[in-house]
Regions:
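Juxtamembrane transmembrane-helix termini
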Residues: 31-34, 38-44, 86-92, 121-131, ...
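Interfacial non-cytosolic loop connecting adjacent transmembrane helices
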Residues: 38-66, 116-146
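Cytosolic juxtamembrane helix at the C-terminal end of the final transmembrane segment
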Residues: 3-10, 82-100, 153-170
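Generic alpha-helical transmembrane segments
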Residues: 66-84
Length: 170
């Protein structure tokens, strides 16, 4: 009997997945401390002075924060689509270890789960869902932790994809 030889897979999806995973992990760990430094002052301001009129600067910071969040949500959904495609593309091949594709898919899925309550609040009629979600005992912190775990797993799997690129030359 002749052995059926599997055709070589392209390393484009591995490169794209690696870059997306590393960038996502970097964004998750850098964003709270560098990109959104004023978010904590806004939260404290809104807790301490709930009945004062917000200043123009505060409104601008809120707008920038919301814009940054929309970019992060778009990034995580693109990463989720790429993770699904690359998981299916490299299934049962030797180029990319199976655990790398699984962890990348898990990282993207956790990121999508963390963004769902806020995304649903943009739908007319469901605008109060974010308030309800954040009022459930510690749900806001659970979503933040889920995003952080997603970033860590994205960083690990992105590095796994980049390391596995040298397997394609064999």
């Amino acid at each position: 009997m002749q052995a059926v030889e599997q055709q070589k897979k392209s390393k484009l999806w591995a490169l794209l997945s690696g870059i997306l995973g590393i960038v996502w992990g970097g964004l998750i760990f850098v964003a709270p401390s560098y990109i959104l430094p004023n978010i904590f002052s806004i939260v404290i301001f809104s807790i301490v002075f709930p009945f004062t009129a917000p200043s123009e600067e505060t409104l601008q910071i809120l707008h920038q924060t919301q814009t940054m969040f929309i970019y992060l949500v778009a990034f995580i959904w693109v990463m989720f689509i790429v993770a699904r495609i690359s998981h299916r593309y490299y299934k049962k091949t030797g180029e990319v270890p199976y655990w790398v594709t699984k962890i990348f898919l898990l990282a993207a899925s956790l990121g999508v789960i963390a963004t769902l309550p806020v995304l649903l609040s943009y739908i007319p009629g469901l605008t109060g869902i974010n308030d309800v979600t954040l009022q459930i005992g510690g749900m806001g912190s659970i979503l933040i932790i889920t995003g952080g775990v997603s970033g860590l797993l994205g960083l690990i799997s992105g590095a796994g994809y980049i390391i596995s690129l040298n397997r394609f030359d064999r």
